[in-house]
């Protein structure tokens, strides 16, 4: 070759080397790919707007895009590179999404033997995990493959000759503004920025939404030696694949450099727009109407079920004969304003009591729970029978309502509440002797009616001050028939079990059962309670004063019976008060046969006849004995104290409460 030609060839070769060196040093930057020097294969293509689409929504497909010129890694120079790209994964409507995208370096642009699906178009079953592959990749994976030990279906991973990542992390970015990591959904369809920096020893990977600066903290930072993976001549590019589920994989822009310092920034404003598939308007409208219809139907069914359950009741065939005495739960719920606390009147062993208002009058609604069906028919029959009782000194019981697990009893509302509120809770006005005597006469008249004048004999079995209600005129009315039992006149009652309240219970209850004389005993205790202003049992007082019956008798023995009266009654009619105290002792005689019946009691209170001649030392007067349970020797009493304990039963529909 002529010397002149040699010189020309040397100059051309030198200039070419300078060009290649400059190209390798400075790298490239594409804000869209209209003029991008890319090689694409598979289903990958550059769209007219400059958007690189690696895959469309076809199934079982793969697509690659390479920078045409290979990267030359000189062993004498540090093995380093940096890249910044923007990608987006857009799902097909109604599809959960396909596989992901990988940024990678490969010794060849020929990946025709690579598989789609979970292999991301980089490997196949043979080349995966093969050191001879010499493929380094950063995967943005949206499918969790157990085969590759993926951590989840939305992660970033570092892959070296295998899709089993050497390190991975859930897709997220560090928010410098808030100082914490925020998750990113790779399949959201939004554009995502990715930075990959390798300085020869440490690999850093960062993510961020479009429009946010590169985070100060990397998502993944790992010390790595890539000298055995990256060969002298490598191609750089992107790969994506679809399986049975498919979506569009897009690259909007890409900047690459062998040096982090010389990496050019992408111009976000020049990036192409990502198309999002739109449903047809008619189909969207139809689906919207269907969804709205389903929501409306669910709301209507829910409202119906709520309303039905809210007012649901339990009704059985045998209850038809008691229909006039039954209230609907809905009417009681509305009458009490949903059992609002403002109408709460009190709470006792039977349950809670609320004031209610019906169109005709005010009512009191007592609600309490029940379990089981034993004796239910008898219980409701007795409620209906009590609704037929008619006496001015009985609280009128209007009827009932029955729900699953709950009873409601409806009675007339008593404005002044119960007698015990005035005796023991300083409720005003203070009860004068004339009012107290009038209350006792009224209750005595009511018991006389129950025992002798009603269609059946009615045993109340729970006479006490808290069950005596007062109307606006302080007329006493006996209420709370939850323990009441009925039997025909002349028949022997068959009640069993000692039920009631300590101090009001006749000592013969457990051995002989309830009778009219046990009601008389309880009324005698009530007489002493009203006259003395003390409860029948006061365990906190000195032992000689704890039992009211015994203490009143002791006062009489000391010839100071009047000292037992309520101190609030000083100056009242002493002879009349003493007579009433003696009547209380007579009614609480230990021997049932020695107690008067209620006919006599009414006559004594009305002073139609005089009390029989007896003294505090007469048999059975002022004597209190413990109550035996079931006729056994088990005494419901503490031996060191004369105070008998309270015995109570919940309602068991026919066997007591």
Swiss-Prot record:
Active site positions, chain numbering: 462
Annotated localization: Cell membrane
Legume-lectin like, as annotated region: 25-257
Sugar-modified residues: 74, 124, 181, 204, 225
Main enzyme class: transferase
Cellular component annotations (GO), alphabetically ordered: plasma membrane
Main localization category: membrane
Superkingdom, taxonomy of origin: Eukaryota
Residue ranges of domain Protein kinase in the record: 339-611
Annotated Gene3D superfamilies: 2.60.120.200, Phosphorylase Kinase, domain 1, Transferase(Phosphotransferase) domain 1
All ranges on the Extracellular side of the membrane: 24-282
Signal sequence annotation: 1-23
Residues reported to bind ATP: 345-353, 366
EC number: 2.7.11.1
Cytoplasmic side of membrane: 304-657
Keyword terms, alphabetized: ATP-binding, Cell membrane, Glycoprotein, Kinase, Lectin, Membrane, Nucleotide-binding, Plant defense, Receptor, Serine/threonine-protein kinase, Signal, Transferase, Transmembrane, Transmembrane helix
Summary of the knockout phenotype: Increased susceptibility to the fungus Alternaria brassicicola.
One GO biological process term: protein autophosphorylation
Pfam families: Lectin_legB, Pkinase
SUPFAM superfamilies the UniProt entry points to: Concanavalin A-like lectins/glucanases, Protein kinase-like (PK-like)
Catalytic activity: L-seryl-[protein] + ATP = O-phospho-L-seryl-[protein] + ADP + H(+); L-threonyl-[protein] + ATP = O-phospho-L-threonyl-[protein] + ADP + H(+)
GO molecular function: ATP binding; carbohydrate binding; kinase activity; NAD+ binding; protein serine kinase activity; protein serine/threonine kinase activity
Membrane-spanning segments: 283-303
Membrane topology of the entry: Single-pass type I membrane protein
Role description: Involved in resistance response to the pathogenic fungus Alternaria brassicicola.
Listed name of the protein: L-type lectin-domain containing receptor kinase I.8
Gene behind the chain: LECRK18
């Amino acid at each position: 070759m002529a010397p002149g030609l040699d010189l020309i060839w040397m100059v051309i070769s030198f200039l070419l080397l300078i060009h290649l060196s400059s190209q390798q040093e400075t790298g490239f930057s594409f804000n869209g790919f209209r003029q991008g020097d890319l090689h694409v294969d598979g289903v990958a293509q550059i769209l007219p707007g400059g958007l690189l689409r690696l895959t469309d929504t076809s199934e079982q497909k793969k697509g690659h895009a390479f920078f045409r010129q290979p990267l030359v890694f000189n062993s004498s120079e540090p093995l380093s590179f940096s890249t910044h790209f923007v990608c987006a994964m857009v799902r097909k409507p109604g599809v959960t999404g396909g596989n992901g995208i990988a940024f990678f370096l490969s010794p060849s642009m020929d990946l025709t033997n690579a598989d789609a699906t979970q292999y991301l178009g980089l490997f196949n079953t043979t080349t995966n995990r093969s050191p001879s592959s010499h493929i380094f990749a950063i995967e943005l994976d949206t499918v969790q493959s157990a085969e590759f030990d993926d951590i989840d279906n939305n992660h970033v991973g570092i892959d070296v000759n295998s899709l089993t990542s050497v390190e991975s992390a859930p897709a997220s970015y560090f928010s410098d503004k808030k100082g914490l990591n925020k998750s990113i959904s790779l399949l959201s369809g939004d554009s995502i920025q990715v930075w990959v920096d390798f300085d020869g020893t440490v690999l850093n990977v960062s993510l961020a939404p479009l429009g946010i600066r590169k985070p100060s903290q990397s998502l993944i930072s790992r010390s790595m030696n890539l000298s055995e993976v990256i060969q002298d001549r490598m191609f750089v590019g992107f790969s994506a694949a679809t399986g049975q589920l498919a979506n569009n994989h897009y690259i909007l822009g890409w900047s690459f450099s062998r040096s982090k310092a010389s990496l050019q920034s992408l111009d976000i404003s020049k990036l192409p727009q990502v198309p999002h598939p739109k449903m047809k308007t008619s189909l969207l409208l139809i689906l919207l109407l269907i969804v709205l219809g389903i929501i409306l139907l669910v709301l209507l069914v829910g409202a119906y079920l709520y309303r039905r359950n809210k007012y649901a009741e339990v009704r059985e065939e045998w209850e038809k004969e008691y229909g006039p005495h039954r209230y609907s739960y809905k009417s009681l719920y509305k009458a009490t304003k949903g059992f609002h606390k403002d109408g709460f009147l009190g709470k006792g062993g039977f349950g809670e009591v609320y004031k209610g208002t019906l169109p005709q009058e005010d009512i009191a609604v007592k609600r309490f729970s029940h379990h089981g069906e034993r004796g239910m028919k008898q219980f409701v029959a007795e409620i209906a029978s009590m609704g037929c009782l008619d006496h001015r000194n009985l609280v009128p019981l209007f009827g009932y309502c029955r729900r699953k697990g709950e009873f409601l009893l409806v009675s007339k509302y008593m404005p002044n509440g119960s007698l015990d509120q005035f005796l023991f809770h300083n409720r005003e006005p203070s009860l004068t002797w004339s009012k107290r005597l009038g209350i006792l006469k009224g209750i005595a008249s009511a018991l006389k009616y129950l025992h002798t004048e009603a269609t059946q004999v009615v045993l109340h079995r729970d006479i006490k001050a808290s069950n005596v209600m007062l109307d606006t005129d302080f007329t006493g009315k006996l209420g709370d028939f939850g323990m009441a039992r009925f039997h025909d006149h002349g028949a022997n009652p068959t009640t069993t079990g000692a039920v009631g309240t300590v101090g009001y219970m006749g000592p013969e209850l457990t051995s002989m059962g309830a009778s009219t004389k046990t009601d008389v005993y309880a009324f005698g205790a009530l007489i002493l309670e009203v006259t003395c202003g003390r409860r029948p049992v006061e365990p906190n007082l000195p032992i000689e004063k704890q039992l009211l019956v015994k203490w009143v008798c002791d006062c009489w023995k000391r010839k100071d019976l009047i000292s037992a009266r309520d101190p609030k009654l000083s100056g009242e009619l002493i002879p009349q008060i003493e007579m009433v105290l003696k009547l209380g002792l007579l009614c609480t005689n230990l021997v049932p046969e020695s107690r008067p019946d209620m006919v006599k009691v009414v006559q004594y209170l009305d002073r139609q006849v005089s009390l029989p001649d007896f003294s505090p030392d007469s048999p059975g007067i002022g004597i209190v004995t413990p109550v035996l349970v079931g006729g056994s020797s088990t005494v419901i009493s503490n031996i060191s104290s004369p105070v008998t304990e309270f015995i109570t039963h919940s309602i068991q529909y026919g066997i007591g409460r």
